[in-house]
A protein has these predicted regions:
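Membrane-interfacial loop-to-helix junctions in multi-pass transporters
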Residues: 16-21, 50-53, 88-95, 124-131, ...
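Hydrophobic, membrane-embedded alpha-helices of multi-pass small-molecule transporters
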Residues: 20-37, 170-256
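Transmembrane helix-boundary motif of multi-pass solute transporters/channels
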Residues: 21-63, 69-70, 266-273
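Hydrophobic alpha-helical transmembrane segments of multi-pass small-molecule transporters/permeases
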Residues: 25-29, 57, 61, 95-106, ...
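Transmembrane alpha-helical segments of multi-pass small-molecule transport proteins
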Residues: 26, 98-99, 122-145, 159-171
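Juxtamembrane transmembrane-helix boundary signature
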Residues: 29, 56-89, 96-104
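Hydrophobic transmembrane alpha-helices that form the core helical bundles
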Residues: 77, 94-125, 132-136
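TM-loop-TM module centered on a large, flexible mid-protein loop between adjacent transmembrane helices
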Residues: 79-93, 247-293
Length: 293
């Protein structure tokens, strides 16, 4: 019987594919961690706590670092999905984990579809219901396509970079008190543990933890020989997430510090949208729509 030739792990094509999968995993984790829920929470907590919320951002990044490093290393070294690892450790627990992640993913993605609808509404004025339907159909088409793998990798990277650049633009437009924000990051006037728990639960828990690591499994970047590359990618991913979170916080802080009162309690409240619009006018609203979508 003919045997398959072993993969040359020093060939330029293998190295290029591995680098591509690592970069895609980085941005998949980053974009998953900064969805409609986090954007809305950041706007709400910044409006109520001001610069002191910077400490909550820092705490979420530190916790994120510990969790993501552990999960990425274990999953890629064992070459097993999280539910399979859990079943090996405690028989039956993997099924419970899978059910919890599926349920959490369903709840969060209902929010993501709603956020996509609101994003298209802010970006082009489309009715949020139709925006959600069109976004869901587009997602189904992309993920059901046989040729979607490489397209998804490229799309994730491009959209992640666009998200950072657009938020940077709004941040500079809002002119936040950066010095005060940096001070409050390490020496906050107030520490709200409920706020920190909410932010951490929405950005570290659930399927977000496993998105990047499972993407590496799909691309074959596994084994002890890849541990250094995986650890480096996890660190870079956390840095990208942290950068994006802090830029978003500063963009909204600039608006709040200027004296603008954001509506965070009414039925139609959309504090993040208000902040972007106050910072950069109609352009800011369109940018918010694109980021949310």
């Amino acid at each position: 019987m003919a045997t398959q030739d072993p993969v040359n792990k020093t060939s330029p094509s293998f190295i290029k594919n591995r680098r591509s999968s690592l970069i895609a995993a980085i941005f998949l984790m980053a974009t998953s961690a900064i969805g409609p829920g986090f954007i809305t929470q950041t706007a709400t907590f910044t409006a109520t706590m001001g610069a002191a919320f910077a400490f909550g951002i820092l705490a979420s990044i530190v916790i994120d670092f510990v969790v993501q490093q552990s999960i990425w290393r274990v999953i890629t070294v064992t070459n097993m999905r999280a539910s399979d690892i859990a079943n090996k450790a405690i028989p039956g627990s993997g099924y419970l984990l899978a059910v919890l992640v599926i349920f959490g993913g369903l709840v969060f993605n209902v929010g993501n579809i709603a956020g996509a609808g609101l994003g298209l509404n802010a970006m082009v004025g489309l009715d949020p219901k139709w925006g959600g339907v069109l976004s869901a159909l587009l997602a189904i088409y992309i993920f059901s396509s046989r040729k979607a793998s490489h397209f998804i990798d490229r799309m994730i990277i491009v959209l992640g970079i666009v998200m950072i650049l657009l938020t940077l633009f709004v941040m500079f437009a809002s002119n936040p008190p950066i010095g005060e924000a940096l001070k409050q990051t390490v020496l906050p006037n107030t520490i709200n543990f409920a706020t920190i728990t909410t932010i951490v639960g929405g950005t570290v828990g659930g399927y977000i933890c496993y998105a990047g690591a499972h993407r590496l499994l799909d691309k074959g970047t596994t084994g002890i020989e890849n541990i250094d590359a995986v650890s480096s990618a996890a660190t870079k991913g956390i840095l990208v997430v942290g950068l994006m979170r802090y830029i978003l916080f500063l963009a909204i802080l600039g608006v709040v510090a200027s004296g603008v009162t954001l509506d965070i309690s009414s039925h139609a409240a959309n504090p993040a949208s208000q902040a972007f619009q106050h910072a950069a006018g109609l352009t800011g609203l369109r940018i918010f729509g694109l980021i949310l979508w």
